[in-house]
Amino acid sequence: MKRKITFLGIFFIAIVVFAQGSGGTNAKYEERYLIDMPTAGIMTKGYSAVSMDVMPDGVVMSKIEVGIYDGFSFGISYGGSNIIGSGQIDWYKLPGINVRVRVMDETVLLPALTLGFDSQGKGEYYSDLERYQIKSPGFFAAGSKNFEFLGYFSVHGMINYTLERKDGDKNLNLGFGFEKTVGGKVSIVGEYDFAFNDHVGSALGKGNGYLNLGARWSVGDGLTLGLNLRDLLDNKRFDSNHADRGIFVEYVKPVF
Protein backbone atom coordinates (compact mmCIF):
# COMPACT_ATOMS: atom_id res chain seq x y z
CA MET A 1 0.00 0.00 0.00
CA LYS A 2 2.75 2.48 0.94
CA ARG A 3 4.56 1.80 -2.34
CA LYS A 4 1.40 2.45 -4.34
CA ILE A 5 0.74 5.72 -2.51
CA THR A 6 4.35 6.77 -3.10
CA PHE A 7 4.08 5.90 -6.81
CA LEU A 8 0.95 8.01 -7.25
CA GLY A 9 2.40 10.79 -5.11
CA ILE A 10 5.33 11.12 -7.50
CA PHE A 11 2.90 12.12 -10.23
CA PHE A 12 1.30 14.79 -8.04
CA ILE A 13 4.65 16.23 -6.96
CA ALA A 14 5.87 16.29 -10.55
CA ILE A 15 2.92 18.48 -11.54
CA VAL A 16 4.54 21.51 -9.91
CA VAL A 17 7.62 21.02 -12.10
CA PHE A 18 6.28 20.55 -15.63
CA ALA A 19 4.93 23.29 -17.88
CA GLN A 20 3.58 24.14 -21.38
CA GLY A 21 -0.11 24.87 -22.21
CA SER A 22 -2.25 23.03 -24.80
CA GLY A 23 -5.54 24.91 -25.23
CA GLY A 24 -6.34 27.49 -27.93
CA THR A 25 -4.47 28.71 -31.00
CA ASN A 26 -1.35 29.43 -28.93
CA ALA A 27 -0.90 25.76 -28.01
CA LYS A 28 2.75 24.75 -28.41
CA TYR A 29 2.43 20.99 -28.75
CA GLU A 30 0.05 18.34 -30.06
CA GLU A 31 -2.89 16.90 -28.16
CA ARG A 32 -2.53 13.12 -27.80
CA TYR A 33 -6.11 12.63 -26.63
CA LEU A 34 -9.37 14.52 -26.96
CA ILE A 35 -10.98 13.17 -23.79
CA ASP A 36 -10.57 9.39 -23.85
CA MET A 37 -9.93 8.91 -27.59
CA PRO A 38 -6.35 8.85 -28.89
CA THR A 39 -5.43 11.27 -31.69
CA ALA A 40 -2.44 11.25 -34.04
CA GLY A 41 -0.66 13.73 -31.75
CA ILE A 42 2.69 12.76 -30.28
CA MET A 43 5.06 14.21 -27.71
CA THR A 44 7.88 16.30 -29.17
CA LYS A 45 11.35 14.84 -28.74
CA GLY A 46 12.86 15.99 -25.46
CA TYR A 47 9.54 17.01 -23.90
CA SER A 48 7.70 15.33 -21.04
CA ALA A 49 4.04 15.64 -20.02
CA VAL A 50 2.41 14.90 -16.67
CA SER A 51 -1.39 14.67 -16.63
CA MET A 52 -4.14 13.75 -14.20
CA ASP A 53 -7.80 12.76 -14.70
CA VAL A 54 -10.23 13.13 -11.78
CA MET A 55 -13.53 11.29 -12.27
CA PRO A 56 -16.61 10.18 -10.28
CA ASP A 57 -16.32 7.56 -7.52
CA GLY A 58 -13.09 9.12 -6.31
CA VAL A 59 -11.19 7.95 -9.40
CA VAL A 60 -7.78 9.55 -10.00
CA MET A 61 -5.55 8.45 -12.89
CA SER A 62 -2.12 10.01 -13.50
CA LYS A 63 0.20 9.64 -16.47
CA ILE A 64 3.67 10.69 -17.54
CA GLU A 65 4.76 10.70 -21.20
CA VAL A 66 8.14 11.43 -22.78
CA GLY A 67 9.11 12.16 -26.38
CA ILE A 68 12.08 9.81 -26.76
CA TYR A 69 12.85 10.36 -30.45
CA ASP A 70 11.30 12.32 -33.29
CA GLY A 71 8.02 10.52 -33.90
CA PHE A 72 8.28 8.14 -30.93
CA SER A 73 6.96 8.55 -27.39
CA PHE A 74 6.51 6.36 -24.33
CA GLY A 75 4.37 6.74 -21.22
CA ILE A 76 3.28 5.02 -18.02
CA SER A 77 0.15 5.60 -15.94
CA TYR A 78 -1.49 4.45 -12.74
CA GLY A 79 -4.47 5.19 -10.53
CA GLY A 80 -7.44 3.79 -8.72
CA SER A 81 -10.94 4.46 -7.44
CA ASN A 82 -12.07 5.89 -4.08
CA ILE A 83 -8.77 7.79 -3.85
CA ILE A 84 -10.75 10.96 -3.16
CA GLY A 85 -13.22 10.41 -0.34
CA SER A 86 -13.18 7.95 2.54
CA GLY A 87 -12.80 4.22 2.93
CA GLN A 88 -10.42 1.78 1.30
CA ILE A 89 -8.72 2.72 -1.97
CA ASP A 90 -9.18 0.29 -4.87
CA TRP A 91 -5.91 0.51 -6.80
CA TYR A 92 -5.72 -0.54 -10.42
CA LYS A 93 -4.35 -4.05 -10.92
CA LEU A 94 -1.38 -2.93 -13.06
CA PRO A 95 0.16 0.31 -14.32
CA GLY A 96 -0.72 1.20 -17.89
CA ILE A 97 1.76 1.67 -20.72
CA ASN A 98 1.48 3.93 -23.75
CA VAL A 99 3.65 3.71 -26.88
CA ARG A 100 3.22 5.84 -30.02
CA VAL A 101 4.93 5.93 -33.42
CA ARG A 102 4.22 8.65 -35.99
CA VAL A 103 4.16 6.94 -39.38
CA MET A 104 3.08 9.93 -41.46
CA ASP A 105 3.19 13.67 -40.81
CA GLU A 106 0.31 15.90 -41.82
CA THR A 107 0.44 17.53 -45.26
CA VAL A 108 -1.84 19.99 -47.05
CA LEU A 109 -3.91 17.10 -48.39
CA LEU A 110 -3.28 14.21 -45.99
CA PRO A 111 -3.79 13.79 -42.24
CA ALA A 112 -1.12 12.82 -39.74
CA LEU A 113 -1.16 9.11 -38.93
CA THR A 114 0.02 7.50 -35.69
CA LEU A 115 0.11 3.86 -34.59
CA GLY A 116 0.18 3.01 -30.92
CA PHE A 117 -0.72 0.88 -27.94
CA ASP A 118 -2.32 2.08 -24.71
CA SER A 119 -3.29 -0.37 -21.95
CA GLN A 120 -4.72 2.26 -19.59
CA GLY A 121 -8.49 2.35 -19.20
CA LYS A 122 -10.37 4.81 -17.00
CA GLY A 123 -12.95 4.72 -14.24
CA GLU A 124 -13.37 1.81 -11.86
CA TYR A 125 -11.62 -1.50 -12.52
CA TYR A 126 -13.82 -4.65 -12.49
CA SER A 127 -11.68 -7.63 -11.50
CA ASP A 128 -14.32 -10.21 -12.43
CA LEU A 129 -14.43 -8.88 -16.01
CA GLU A 130 -10.75 -7.86 -16.10
CA ARG A 131 -11.68 -4.48 -17.58
CA TYR A 132 -12.02 -0.82 -16.76
CA GLN A 133 -15.31 1.06 -16.77
CA ILE A 134 -13.97 2.83 -19.88
CA LYS A 135 -11.99 0.23 -21.79
CA SER A 136 -8.38 0.95 -22.70
CA PRO A 137 -7.73 1.69 -26.39
CA GLY A 138 -5.31 -1.22 -26.73
CA PHE A 139 -3.80 -1.27 -30.22
CA PHE A 140 -4.89 1.76 -32.24
CA ALA A 141 -4.38 3.74 -35.42
CA ALA A 142 -5.33 7.42 -35.33
CA GLY A 143 -5.50 10.12 -37.99
CA SER A 144 -5.73 13.90 -37.43
CA LYS A 145 -6.17 16.85 -39.81
CA ASN A 146 -6.11 20.58 -38.97
CA PHE A 147 -7.93 23.38 -40.77
CA GLU A 148 -7.89 27.15 -40.37
CA PHE A 149 -11.44 28.27 -39.54
CA LEU A 150 -11.92 31.16 -37.12
CA GLY A 151 -8.76 29.93 -35.46
CA TYR A 152 -8.12 26.21 -35.82
CA PHE A 153 -10.50 23.31 -36.33
CA SER A 154 -9.16 19.75 -36.07
CA VAL A 155 -10.87 16.49 -36.98
CA HIS A 156 -9.76 13.11 -35.68
CA GLY A 157 -10.55 9.47 -36.40
CA MET A 158 -9.49 6.25 -34.71
CA ILE A 159 -9.74 2.47 -35.02
CA ASN A 160 -8.73 0.33 -32.06
CA TYR A 161 -8.66 -3.18 -30.64
CA THR A 162 -8.60 -3.49 -26.85
CA LEU A 163 -7.20 -6.44 -24.92
CA GLU A 164 -10.04 -6.18 -22.35
CA ARG A 165 -12.23 -8.94 -23.79
CA LYS A 166 -13.31 -11.16 -20.89
CA ASP A 167 -16.78 -9.56 -21.00
CA GLY A 168 -17.31 -11.43 -24.28
CA ASP A 169 -17.15 -8.41 -26.60
CA LYS A 170 -14.05 -8.76 -28.80
CA ASN A 171 -15.00 -6.45 -31.67
CA LEU A 172 -12.89 -3.82 -33.36
CA ASN A 173 -13.94 -0.30 -32.44
CA LEU A 174 -14.17 3.09 -34.16
CA GLY A 175 -14.30 6.67 -32.96
CA PHE A 176 -14.15 10.22 -34.28
CA GLY A 177 -13.90 13.67 -32.76
CA PHE A 178 -12.99 17.33 -33.11
CA GLU A 179 -11.18 20.21 -31.45
CA LYS A 180 -12.12 23.86 -32.03
CA THR A 181 -10.02 26.71 -30.69
CA VAL A 182 -11.79 29.68 -29.10
CA GLY A 183 -9.26 32.48 -28.95
CA GLY A 184 -5.66 31.95 -27.97
CA LYS A 185 -6.14 29.95 -24.77
CA VAL A 186 -9.37 27.92 -24.94
CA SER A 187 -10.41 24.86 -26.96
CA ILE A 188 -13.66 22.91 -27.13
CA VAL A 189 -13.26 19.17 -27.72
CA GLY A 190 -15.76 16.43 -28.51
CA GLU A 191 -15.66 12.75 -29.39
CA TYR A 192 -17.99 9.89 -30.24
CA ASP A 193 -16.89 6.35 -29.41
CA PHE A 194 -19.06 3.84 -31.28
CA ALA A 195 -18.28 1.31 -28.50
CA PHE A 196 -18.59 -1.66 -30.85
CA ASN A 197 -16.42 -3.46 -28.27
CA ASP A 198 -18.72 -2.67 -25.33
CA HIS A 199 -22.31 -3.68 -26.07
CA VAL A 200 -22.68 -7.49 -26.14
CA GLY A 201 -22.10 -10.32 -23.66
CA SER A 202 -21.34 -8.99 -20.19
CA ALA A 203 -20.34 -5.57 -21.53
CA LEU A 204 -21.19 -2.44 -19.56
CA GLY A 205 -22.61 -0.47 -22.51
CA LYS A 206 -26.11 -0.51 -23.99
CA GLY A 207 -25.19 0.07 -27.64
CA ASN A 208 -25.67 3.84 -27.84
CA GLY A 209 -21.97 4.62 -27.99
CA TYR A 210 -20.20 7.16 -25.80
CA LEU A 211 -20.56 10.86 -26.59
CA ASN A 212 -18.16 13.05 -24.62
CA LEU A 213 -17.58 16.82 -24.58
CA GLY A 214 -14.95 18.94 -22.87
CA ALA A 215 -13.11 22.24 -22.64
CA ARG A 216 -9.40 23.01 -22.33
CA TRP A 217 -7.91 26.24 -20.94
CA SER A 218 -4.23 27.17 -21.05
CA VAL A 219 -4.01 29.01 -17.76
CA GLY A 220 -0.49 30.28 -18.34
CA ASP A 221 3.10 29.19 -18.82
CA GLY A 222 2.18 25.60 -19.47
CA LEU A 223 -0.66 24.77 -17.10
CA THR A 224 -3.67 23.33 -18.92
CA LEU A 225 -6.95 22.75 -17.08
CA GLY A 226 -9.92 20.89 -18.49
CA LEU A 227 -13.53 20.00 -17.75
CA ASN A 228 -15.06 16.81 -19.19
CA LEU A 229 -18.61 15.54 -19.61
CA ARG A 230 -18.72 11.83 -20.39
CA ASP A 231 -21.55 9.58 -21.63
CA LEU A 232 -24.03 12.24 -22.72
CA LEU A 233 -26.07 9.52 -24.49
CA ASP A 234 -26.50 7.52 -21.26
CA ASN A 235 -24.87 4.41 -22.69
CA LYS A 236 -23.74 2.69 -19.49
CA ARG A 237 -26.00 0.03 -18.01
CA PHE A 238 -25.34 1.13 -14.42
CA ASP A 239 -25.74 4.52 -12.69
CA SER A 240 -27.54 5.87 -15.75
CA ASN A 241 -29.62 8.99 -16.47
CA HIS A 242 -26.79 11.47 -16.05
CA ALA A 243 -23.44 12.39 -17.56
CA ASP A 244 -20.19 11.97 -15.66
CA ARG A 245 -18.29 15.14 -14.78
CA GLY A 246 -14.51 15.14 -14.57
CA ILE A 247 -11.45 17.37 -14.26
CA PHE A 248 -8.28 17.20 -16.35
CA VAL A 249 -4.88 18.75 -15.55
CA GLU A 250 -1.71 18.64 -17.66
CA TYR A 251 1.80 20.13 -17.75
CA VAL A 252 4.52 19.84 -20.38
CA LYS A 253 8.17 20.84 -20.15
CA PRO A 254 11.41 20.16 -22.06
CA VAL A 255 13.56 17.71 -20.10
CA PHE A 256 16.47 17.02 -22.48
For each of these PLM feature ranges, what is it?
Residues 6-10:
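Sec-dependent N-terminal signal peptides
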Residues 20-155, 159-164, 179-256:
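Transmembrane beta-barrel domains of Gram-negative outer membranes and organellar outer membranes
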Residues 14-19:
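N-terminal signal peptide c-region/cleavage motif recognized by signal peptidases
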Residues 1-4:
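Positively charged n-region of N-terminal signal peptides that target proteins for export
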Residues 173-178:
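A contiguous pocket-lining binding segment that forms or flanks enzyme active sites
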